[in-house]
From Swiss-Prot:
PANTHER family tied to this protein: CLEAVAGE AND POLYADENYLATION SPECIFICITY FACTOR FAMILY MEMBER (PTHR11203), CLEAVAGE AND POLYADENYLATION SPECIFICITY FACTOR SUBUNIT 3 (PTHR11203:SF11)
Active-site residues (renumbered): 422
Protein family membership: Belongs to the metallo-beta-lactamase superfamily. RNA-metabolizing metallo-beta-lactamase-like family. CPSF2/YSH1 subfamily.
Protein name: Endoribonuclease YSH1
Function text: Component of the cleavage factor I (CF I) involved in pre-mRNA 3'-end processing.
Pfam families, sorted: Beta-Casp, CPSF73-100_C, Lactamase_B, RMMBL
One CC-aspect GO term: mRNA cleavage and polyadenylation specificity factor complex
Disordered, as annotated region: 521-560
Sorted UniProt keywords: Endonuclease, Hydrolase, Metal-binding, mRNA processing, Nuclease, Nucleus, Zinc
Organism for this UniProt entry: Debaryomyces hansenii (strain ATCC 36239 / CBS 767 / BCRC 21394 / JCM 1990 / NBRC 0083 / IGC 2968) (Yeast)
EC id: 3.1.27.-
Gene Ontology molecular-function annotations: 5'-3' RNA exonuclease activity; metal ion binding; RNA binding; RNA endonuclease activity
Group of enzyme by EC: hydrolase
Length: 815
């Protein structure tokens, strides 16, 4: 397990788990996890292994957790185990690939079932190194499994974005083969780019790999050729055609093992063009020996619209003489039956499979190997453990695929000219630099080339180490887990009525600020005009004009800062809705419009009885909350509302018969404040009976005297039982009382520096600290001071003082 960094507060872990294709080429399959979303990338087989051992390590991961499976292209090492995953595991996710990939997938895997030893069919030409292996029972899946999986596959267009349950992914051209794509994946703000196999080199029919317009955080890229550098395309083509030409003139035969689809079509285009330019070769046949390639040629003829500009212009030309399909060959024929193939003279055969494990290419190799006039040209990447890889060592003998006890002398020449549509080091490094990720995970490469590529990349970005731009490179092995801590910023969108209120508020603030700016600019301009009317030299006038401009710029900068202060830090209250990692802040009434959520109103009601009268109850409520709004007060009902949230009602007739007040308290449970306020009201009502204040308010002095007790007069005891006055001390705090409390706070902060203005009856005050003087107007609650720091400090104290001095609920203003 590789850990990039220890998880910290506010971070989520991104996890990469390689089930195949890590430190190897073949059976590509990778799992990425983030925020409980799981994506599988490719599902291939290893071309050098047989049966279940050729599969990725599916038993090491719970495939039922996978939400989406994305297939980059149709090659067997990326797609051949897909039917097995979909039909023989607990995988329940959705599968996506491009239209062209799906069109070829059906034919390719049908041929795979028949031809390989895994299929075990009657037509299979087997290459089983183990004579005791039970090929008939080693089927990974059947044709029926293949067709059922085919029906479940969904397609995606290039440059289109699909969003499913919080996962967004977009397909981009990857080059490599027809239909190949790289996926740009977004999960909860994290951006991941999976290149699959890709090519940045232009060829005859495919578009080069695209660079996505958005920078990914994590790049998962191939490392097939490590730090190797490709020979230029034109030089490769010239070298290949020269070898073919010279071999044919000597009477030899050329075998070109290829994958049935992909590079085969590119090589056929090269040969078709070369034959058209050389009349001496036009009587020599070119064959492509693959029933699969023949079936899929119609797909290539159909999907010319996703090929490069040259192909698209040729196929869409308005002039019928120029319009042609480049895949309708003139000099190339297909071989339908190898048993009837007559190979007595020189010829060129493009045959599959490319790894020479079995099939037509292996049979022709064994047939032509003893003749030194013949040649085999290896045009693709050769995987470890295959005949193609062994052949590059130029062995003296090769083993027969049909009879493992028989060896065949090898005298034909072997040439390696790689037309594999994979990036070399320069192309890979250039692409990485363009997308500029901070984390790179290398896949699809043998251990040594991958290790060299990792070292080269770390050396290239060594100057960034220890900085925020540091680039980290990982090269995990199969079944290794890479964990990367991702720290993201959560941003919520304000929608609906709440957004309209905020826009209105911002417009008002901006409009006010613009007016202030214009006034200041006009004042400065007027001052400048007054100065210019005086007789002065041109030099002095220019200087003052420049000073005026600087003053305006300075004031504009200050005003800009004030705007920032005004527009930030404002608290918003609403319902935060989270869906697919998107956060939206709404008011309750907007939920139905912007979400699929339904809303209900829950109203609480409680009945209680107290031994007191209405006036005493009202007095206690006013002492706590200040103002209470009386809705009804007649012979039958008394009702009030506290802070527009708590409704209290009393049925007077029922209360008289019950010997106390029967009180009904109701409130809507739509926020925490309402529930807290209701708890406070109920607590006050229940405590009225036993409150010492209630005893004092309702007690009377005796009308007679007690001789044995010294008669004393208690002011509290003199309070009559008549209802307390409407305007009690707390509910109707006088302005002077509030000013006194605010002044006390300022006094505690500034001491003797606080002076009350003479003759203003405490309505104004000044604070002098050093050279800075602040003038305070208590009635308007304004502070005038040339020091912003001092002014902000005083305003903050006044703001807190107002909150402390004011009751919870204010009296309604009357006009």
């Amino acid at each position: 397990m590789t850990v990039d960094s220890q998880p910290a507060d506010g971070t989520d872990d991104f996890k990469f788990f390689g089930l195949g294709g890590c430190n190897e080429v073949g059976r590509s399959c990778h799992i990425i996890e983030y925020k409980n979303k799981v994506i599988m990338l490719d599902a291939g087989v290893h071309p050098g292994l047989q049966g279940l051992s050729s599969l990725p390590f599916y038993d090491e991961y719970d495939l039922s957790k996978v939400d989406i499976l994305l297939v980059s292209h149709f090659h067997l090492d990326h797609a051949a185990s897909l039917p097995y995953v979909m039909q023989h595991t607990n995988f329940n996710g959705r599968v996506f690939m491009t239209h062209a990939t799906k069109a070829i997938y059906r034919w390719l895997l049908s041929d795979f079932v028949k031809v390989t030893s895994i299929g075990g069919g009657s037509d299979a030409r087997l290459n089983n190194s183990d004579p005791n292996a039970n090929t008939g029972s080693s089927n990974l899946y059947t044709d029926d499994d293949l067709m059922r999986s085919f029906d479940r596959i969904e397609t995606i267009d290039y440059h289109s974005t699909i969003e499913l349950d919080g996962i967004r992914f977009t397909a981009y051209h990857a080059g490599h083969v027809l239909g190949a794509c790289m996926y740009f994946i977004e999960i909860g703000g994290l951006k991941v780019l999976f290149t699959g196999d890709y090519s940045s080199e232009e060829d005859r029919h495919l578009q080069v790999a695209e660079v996505p317009p958005i920078k990914p955080d994590i790049l998962i890229t191939e490392s097939t050729f490590g730090t190797a550098t490709h020979e230029p395309r034109l030089e490769k083509e010239t070298r290949m055609t020269n070898i073919i030409h010279s071999t044919l003139l000597k009477g030899g035969r050329i075998l070109m093992p290829v994958f049935a689809l992909g590079r085969a079509q590119e090589l056929l285009l090269i040969l078709e063009e070369y034959w058209s330019l050389n009349d001496d070769l036009q009587n020599i046949n070119i064959y492509y020996a693959s029933s699969l390639a023949r079936k899929c040629m119609a797909v290539y003829q159909t999907y010319t619209n996703i090929m490069n500009d040259s192909i698209r212009l040729t196929t869409s030309a308005t002039n019928s003489s120029k319009k042609q399909n480049p895949f309708q060959f003139k000099f190339i024929k297909s071989i339908k039956n190898l048993d009837k193939f007559q190979d007595f003279g020189p010829c060129v055969v493009v045959a599959s499979p490319g790894m020479l494990q079995n099939g037509v290419s292996r049979e022709l190799l064994e047939r032509w190997a003893p003749d030194p006039k013949n040649a085999v040209i290896m045009t693709g990447y050769s995987v470890e453990g295959t005949m193609a890889k062994d052949l590059l060592t130029e062995p003296h003998t090769i083993q027969s695929a049909m009879n493992s006890d028989m060896t065949i002398p090898r005298r034909l020449s072997i040439e390696e000219i790689s037309f594999a549509a994979h990036v070399d080091f320069q192309q890979n490094a250039s692409f990485i630099e363009k997308v500029n990720p901070s984390k790179i995970i290398l896949v699809h490469g043998e251990s040594n080339p991958m290790g060299r590529l990792k070292s080269a990349l770390l050396s290239k970005y060594a100057s960034r180490k220890g900085t925020e731009q540091e680039v980290k490179v990982f090269n995990p092995r199969n079944c290794d887990e890479v964990t990367i801590g991702i720290k993201g910023l959560k941003v919520a969108k304000v929608l609906g009525t709440l957004a309209e209120e905020q826009l209105s508020y911002l417009k008002k603030e901006i409009s006010t600020q613009i007016k202030k700016d214009n006034v200041k600019i006009e004042e400065l301009s007027d001052d400048n005009m007054d100065k210019e009317t005086m007789p002065e030299s041109d030099e002095k006038a220019d200087k003052e004009s420049e000073d005026t401009k600087n003053d305006i710029d300075k004031n504009n900068d200050e005003n800009a800062n004030e705007k920032n202060i005004i527009s930030t830090g404002k608290a918003l209250s609403g319902v935060l809705v989270s869906k697919d990692f998107d956060l939206n802040l709404l008011q309750l009434q907007d939920l139905h419009e912007f979400t699929q959520l339904s809303t209900s109103i829950v109203k609480s009601k409680i009945n209680l009885k107290i031994n007191a009268d209405i006036s005493l109850m009202k007095w206690h409520l006013e002492q706590m909350f200040g103002f209470i709004s009386i809705l009804a007060d007649d012979e039958e009902t008394w009702e009030c509302v506290i802070m527009d949230m708590i409704d209290i009602s009393v049925e007077k007739n029922n209360s008289q018969s019950a010997g106390g007040l029967l009180i009904n308290v109701e409130w809507v449970n739509d926020n925490l404040m309402a529930d807290s306020l209701a708890d406070s009201v109920i607590a006050i009502l229940y405590s009225i009976d036993s409150s010492p204040a209630s005893v004092k308010l309702t007690s009377k002095s005796c009308s007679h005297s007690h001789n044995k007790v010294k008669e004393e007069v208690d002011d509290d005891a003199m309070i009559e039982s008549t209802p307390p006055p409407e305007k009690n001390a707390h509910a109707n705090s006088e302005i002077s009382s509030r000013i006194h409390r605010i002044t006390s706070l300022l006094k505690a902060q500034f001491g003797d520096s606080l002076k009350t203005a003479a003759g203003e009856e405490g309505k104004k005050a000044t604070i002098v600290i050093g050279k800075n003087e602040a003038k305070i107007d208590y009635l308007n609650l304004t502070v005038d001071c040339n020091s912003r720091v001092l002014r902000d400090r005083i305003e903050n104290i006044i703001k807190r003082g107002c909150g402390l001095a004011a009751p919870l609920s204010q009296y309604e203003k009357t006009t």
